[in-house]
Amino acid sequence: KQFTKCKLSDELKDMNGHGGITLAEWICIIFHMSGYDTETVVSNNGNREYGLFQINNKIWCRDNENLQSRNICDISCDKFLDDDLTDDKMCAKKILDKEGIDYWLAHKPLCSEKLEQWQCEKW
């Protein structure tokens, strides 16, 4: 599913403030990682990253490509490609709690300041 900034902000509002990260930061990260598209899969050095949050099949989820995954989120990676963001958010929060926000490489260079553009005007 291709989200818009405002629709995604609505879906992710319960993540605002989790681990000290604002909703605008999440929206910015997701834009740069997946373009707000839930069906994004990126192959990288033999690993794959899935969905809005680009969650990795080596550590966080399991797929047919990497049966040795640590699968910390205890989930099949393809669950991150559907329209239901409940499991995506759960795993992203787990990643944030364990690894910190810089797990998402877009954060530091692109999403740590000037965040007004990532806010939905409705609020």
UniProtKB/Swiss-Prot annotation:
InterPro entries: Glyco_hydro_22, Glyco_hydro_22_CS, Lactalbumin, Lysozyme-like_dom_sf. GO terms for molecular function: calcium ion binding; lactose synthase activity; lysozyme activity. Residues 1-123 form the C-type lysozyme domain. Its main location: secreted. Keywords: Calcium, Disulfide bond, Lactose biosynthesis, Metal-binding, Milk protein, Secreted. It comes from the Eukaryota. Disulfide bonds join C6-C120, C28-C111, C61-C77, C73-C91. GO terms for biological process: defense response to Gram-negative bacterium; defense response to Gram-positive bacterium; lactose biosynthetic process. Signal peptide: none annotated. It holds the Pfam family Lys. It is found in: Secreted. Ca(2+) binds at K79, D82, D84, D87, D88. One of its GO terms (cellular component) is extracellular region. Mammary gland specific. Secreted in milk. Belongs to the glycosyl hydrolase 22 family. Lactose synthase (LS) is a heterodimer of a catalytic component, beta1,4-galactosyltransferase (beta4Gal-T1) and a regulatory component, alpha-lactalbumin (LA). Regulatory subunit of lactose synthase, changes the substrate specificity of galactosyltransferase in the mammary gland making glucose a good acceptor substrate for this enzyme. This enables LS to synthesize lactose, the major carbohydrate component of milk. In other tissues, galactosyltransferase transfers galactose onto the N-acetylglucosamine of the oligosaccharide chains in glycoproteins. This is Alpha-lactalbumin. The lineage of its organism: Eukaryota, Metazoa, Chordata, Craniata, Vertebrata. The gene is LALBA.
